[in-house]
């Protein structure tokens, strides 16, 4: 399968990673990333691009995977990859629900939320992306206005 991510002399095969079979550039398999503590998830900035790859370069992590049409087709057809995308989305929603530090005008987790919505829309379905987005807005409730309108706009258009 297609795209490789080269960084620090390491290579990741994104399709195999999303199927839970091959490690990322740090030797972590998908299941390991989903077992991170909230502190690890907050302090580590290169895993979200592996869990939720896109067909465009990351502005945050140089060298992050950029999906090809072949990658997208393979991921869409893979029961394992689809299941792992759903698990990853659920895990990240849990992280957001347990932590409130992102409920502020500017936070790097706002970019992560946009990436997850875009990736789910690209690789899973509009329904999965919209359900994720709706849960994020639901977590915010009365605090919705604490989030920068530009971030909310990105979420709505992702």
Q: Which positions does each model-derived feature cover?
A:
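Alpha-helical bundle/repeat cores within regulatory domains of eukaryotic proteins
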Residues: 95-158
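N-terminal leader regions that mediate targeting or early regulatory function
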Residues: 2-100, 117-120, 127, 135, ...
